[in-house]
Amino acid sequence: MTLAEEFRSRNFSIYGQWTGVLCIILCIALGIANIFSFAVLRIIFSVLCLYAMSGLILIFIEVPFLLRICPTSSKFDAFIRRFTTNWMRAAMYAIMSVVQWLSLLPGSGASSLIVAAVFLLIASIFYALAGLKSQEFVGSKTLGGQGLVQMIV
């Protein structure tokens, strides 16, 4: 399946996965941009956006090919493999979005981390729609889904 065929399939998990890739880029970029701030709360939320929750964890969840080529522990692999259903991914993205929405707390002030919160929420909605429509989770072959992983093994 080509990328265009994947988008025409109307499977919301594909939309969620590609929105997740956009979230990876946004979380890493905005996490780095907001870490250079004088507001302590904003620094904490930018670290959460960059390292602890969003950016680096999402890379391994949304690009399964990386689990094959990067040396990771078995505990980390087991943690990542928990997010194989649409509902688990929707819940994960919703939690990450709520954490970034909390960056609006009065001590932090408004920042560009809101963009990450919005896109994490959109990805959560896509995965929830896939779950509501009882669509199977389908990983994009471009990102290392079924086709690419089989070629490497």
Curated annotation (Swiss-Prot):
GO terms for biological process: vesicle-mediated transport. The keyword Acetylation does not apply. It holds the Pfam family Cg6151-P. The keyword Lipoprotein does not apply. InterPro entries: TVP18/Ca-channel_flower. The chain crosses the membrane at residues 21-41, 43-63, 90-110, 112-132. Golgi membrane protein involved in vesicular trafficking. Belongs to the TVP18 family. This is Golgi apparatus membrane protein tvp18. The lineage of its organism: Eukaryota, Fungi, Dikarya, Ascomycota, Pezizomycotina. The gene is tvp18.
